[in-house]
Amino acid sequence: MQQFEEVRTILEKAKKITVLTGAGASTESGIPDFRSANGLYADANVEMYLSRGYYNRSPKEFWKHYKEIFQINTFHQYKPNRGHRFLAELEEQGKDITILTQNIDGLHQVGGSKHVIDLHGTLQTAHCPKCKMGYDLQYMIDHEVPRCEKCNFILNPDVVLYGDTLPQYQNAIKRLYETDVLIVMGTSLKVQPVASFPQIAKREVGATTILVNEELTGQEYNFDYVFQNKIGEFVEGLSSIK
């Protein structure tokens, strides 16, 4: 309980809080961890189907697999969970908080967070590769192969595909170097370059670092506080302190 008290005090005093979230932030909403043994990435061909090269070569087939892999026709059923709401509430209290998320579900924004950097893009939108007009998830659901209404070009999803660079990487690094506190929630820290963020925050920036993850990551030495809990349990622990 002492750790919860200390972390609550740290969050109350912090000027700039940065939160890195992974799949564990969304599994409590019922969204499968795509990288788990039984997840949607378990198919050996998934990396090919979700690659920039495949989209460029076979955009119609790409959209078929994209919709199947991410099950976008049922995506509206997923709702923000207590972890999403907790982060949004911190922002509503006036905290300068930015979320760096590896998730592509858009639930941080749906939950009310305003300052979110989608490191791997988002399933919620797509755009025309020619005129850049944006389209929402419902438009993608309604059209087997979604095309721009103006240009008739097949839409480009706003998820970062294999073979793409991370367009938001520099923005994320800039935020890391400004932060007082880094909270890492629901990620195994196995995927680079995101896996290096805790070390940057602790060793180079001198920020207080907090890990919330059910399983150990092998990077516990980069954290001042380690909570081997579900995110909902962590939030409950903080909330129980009077």
UniProtKB/Swiss-Prot annotation:
GO molecular function: histone deacetylase activity, NAD-dependent; NAD+ binding; zinc ion binding
Active-site residues, Swiss-Prot/TrEMBL: H120 (proton acceptor)
One Pfam match: SIR2
Localization terms from the record: Cytoplasm
Cofactor(s) essential for the protein: Zn(2+)
Residues binding Zn(2+): C128, C131, C148, C151
Main subcellular location: cytoplasm
Entry's Gene Ontology cellular component terms: cytoplasm
Domain Deacetylase sirtuin-type: 1-242
InterPro entries: DHS-like_NAD/FAD-binding_dom, NAD-dep_sirtuin_deacylases, Sirtuin, Sirtuin_cat_small_dom_sf, Sirtuin_class_U, Ssirtuin_cat_dom
Cofactor stoichiometry and binding remark: Binds 1 zinc ion per subunit.
E.C. number: 2.3.1.286
Record key words, sorted: Cytoplasm, Metal-binding, NAD, Transferase, Zinc
Protein family per UniProt: Belongs to the sirtuin family. Class U subfamily.
PANTHER family: NAD-DEPENDENT PROTEIN DEACYLASE (PTHR11085:SF4), NAD-DEPENDENT PROTEIN DEACYLASE SIRTUIN-5, MITOCHONDRIAL-RELATED (PTHR11085)
Function: NAD-dependent protein deacetylase which modulates the activities of several enzymes which are inactive in their acetylated form.
Designated name of the protein: NAD-dependent protein deacetylase
Organism (species): Bacillus anthracis
